Curated annotation (Swiss-Prot):
Name the record gives this protein: Small ribosomal subunit protein uS12
Coiled coil start-end: none
Source organism, top-level taxon: Eukaryota
GO terms for cellular component: small ribosomal subunit
Biased composition (Basic and acidic residues): 21-30
Gene name in the database record: RPS23
Organism: Fragaria ananassa
PROSITE patterns: RIBOSOMAL_S12 (PS00055)
Biased composition (Basic residues): 11-20
Record-level Gene Ontology MF annotations: structural constituent of ribosome
Record-level GO BP terms: translation
Region listing for Disordered, in residue ranges: 1-30
Keyword annotations of the record: Hydroxylation, Ribonucleoprotein, Ribosomal protein
Length: 142
C-alpha cells in the first residue's frame, strides 16, 4: 500500500507527515525544547566558579586519573564536572576561580574514557588556559 491519492487526500497526507516528523532526530531536538533544560541552556560557553578540584578514574581498559574541576555555573547555579586539558594545567586553577567552560566535542556526550564529563575548561580568570600552559601569559593576581 502506498500513499493516499486523490483530491480529498490532503488532510490525511498532511497529518501523516506531521506525525512522521517526530521520528527525525534533528526535528525532535529543535522542537521539544530540551536545549533549555541542559546546563548551558542553549549557549556554547558559560562562566562558573570552581568549587573543588577532582580526579575522575578513566574507564576500562585505561588506567588513569583524569584531572577535572567541579564548577558551579553563574547563570543558573547548576553544578557540573569540567575536564582540565593538558599536562599540569590543574595547577593554574584554584578554588573560587572564575572559569569559562565549553562543550567537549560530542554534542552533549562524554568524550573518550572520562565517564560523565561533558565539558572542558577554556579560560581561568579571563586568561586562556592554553596561554598559561605555553607560558605566554600569566594569571592575574587576585
Amino acid at each position: 500500500m502506498g500513499k493516499t491519492r486523490g483530491m480529498g487526500a490532503a488532510r490525511k497526507l498532511k497529518n501523516h507527515r506531521r506525525r512522521q516528523r517526530w521520528a527525525d532526530k534533528s526535528y525532535k531536538k529543535s522542537h521539544l525544547g530540551n536545549e533549555w533544560k541542559k546546563p548551558f541552556a542553549g549557549s556554547s560557553h558559560a562562566k562558573g566558579i570552581v568549587l573543588e578540584k577532582i580526579g575522575i578514574e578513566a574507564k576500562q581498559p585505561n588506567s588513569a586519573i583524569r584531572k577535572c574541576a567541579r564548577v558551579q555555573l553563574i547563570k543558573n547555579g547548576k553544578k557540573i564536572a569540567a575536564f582540565v586539558p593538558n599536562d599540569g594545567c590543574l595547577n593554574y586553577i584554584e578554588e573560587n576561580d572564575e572559569v569559562l567552560i565549553a562543550g567537549f566535542g560530542r554534542k552533549g556526550h562524554a568524550v573518550g574514557d572520562i565517564p560523565g564529563v561533558r565539558f572542558k575548561v577554556v579560560k581561568v580568570s579571563g586568561v586562556s588556559l592554553l596561554a598559561l600552559f605555553k607560558e605566554k601569559k600569566e594569571k592575574p593576581r587576585s
